[in-house]
Amino acid sequence: MNEQGKAINSSAESRIQLESSWKAHVGNWLLRPEMRDLSSFLRARKVAGVSVYPPGSQIFAAFEATPFQRVKAVILGQDPYHGQGQAHGLCFSVRPGMPLPPSLLNIYKELEEDLGLLRPDHGCLLPWAKRGVLLLNAVLTVEDGRAGAHQGKGWEGFTDHVVDTLNREREGLVFMLWGSYAQAKGKAIDTRRHLVLKAPHPSPLSAHRGFLGCRHFSLCNQYLSQHGLGMVDWSLPPCIALDGAILNGRIAV
């Protein structure tokens, strides 16, 4: 690469709003041509007046909340919630004050059945992320009212690379794969190095087929304890007790 090309890449890399430890491990992927095409697509949609979620500053919130070396468990989602004010960059999570989506209600039901933790009065899973649970969607953006609108636009290659990097460079992680989409995305995870937990999606359409009763939260902690990473505190504080300094920052709301 000539000096001009190096300078362009250096300038582009400096603009990537990715947490520093993740940038060191996967940031180069964002410099690929398909990611530049994705960036152009997102700009064009916004210029056309389309509402894209989550806000730009929160697209990489999962990485900001859970640095690379702090990851203990990974929950894979598909794409962000497509209602106004819901998505804030963490899969299955919604901002405080938003109604609880049906899938999240079922996650809370399983949490109570498995660990005896009562359902909180909000749907913000940021405390999990801060404790080492990477809440990663396969596709990091969506359009208002159009689920899956940004599938096939380039995000999947990046998030595949994220999963592959964790698979290769970390050991003793727990991957929680709920539904066929997440299971297909995690099919190459080395089960000799990590624990892979599979269950149907927590959607009301499938939760009764095996998600409810899967006991993934306790199984996760059992494995983490055995491998010296420390268990995840799956409890969630009431909305009034959520850390306001965090919630007012760019990684949450």
Swiss-Prot record:
InterPro entries reported for this sequence: UDG_fam1, Ura-DNA_Glyclase_AS, Uracil-DNA_glycosylase-like, Uracil-DNA_glycosylase-like_sf
EC primary class: hydrolase
GO cellular component: cytoplasm
UniProt xrefs under Pfam families: UDG
Entry's Gene Ontology molecular function annotations: uracil DNA N-glycosylase activity
Active-site residues annotated for this sequence: 79
EC number: 3.2.2.27
Keyword Hydrolase carried by entry: yes
PROSITE patterns: U_DNA_GLYCOSYLASE
Catalytic activity: Hydrolyzes single-stranded DNA or mismatched double-stranded DNA and polynucleotides, releasing free uracil
Gene Ontology BP term (one): base-excision repair, AP site formation via deaminated base removal
Compartmental location: Cytoplasm
SMART domains for this protein: UDG, UreE_C
Keywords: Cytoplasm, DNA damage, DNA repair, Hydrolase
Known function: Excises uracil residues from the DNA which can arise as a result of misincorporation of dUMP residues by DNA polymerase or due to deamination of cytosine.
Stored PANTHER family: URACIL-DNA GLYCOSYLASE
UniProt family annotation: Belongs to the uracil-DNA glycosylase (UDG) superfamily. UNG family.
Protein name according to UniProt: Uracil-DNA glycosylase
